[in-house]
Amino acid sequence: MEISLLNIIACPLCQGQLLLQEQELVCQIDALAYPVRTNIPVLLVSEARNILVK
């Protein structure tokens, strides 16, 4: 994924900043990680994984 995209895209849920961590885009506000598949970010809430430890 191109790093320059991070300046353009935002979390689809809260419109907050996303951080690239390995193969995921992480929203720290919502504690969601969106997958990046074949260099394409999948910014669907239904595809996101909750990163909170239970």
Swiss-Prot record:
InterPro entries given in the database record: Trm112-like
The protein's name: UPF0434 protein BCI_0256
Domain of life of the organism encoding this protein: Bacteria
SUPFAM superfamilies: Trm112p-like (SSF158997)
Family: Belongs to the UPF0434 family.
Pfam families in UniProt: Trm112p
Organism annotation: Baumannia cicadellinicola subsp. Homalodisca coagulata
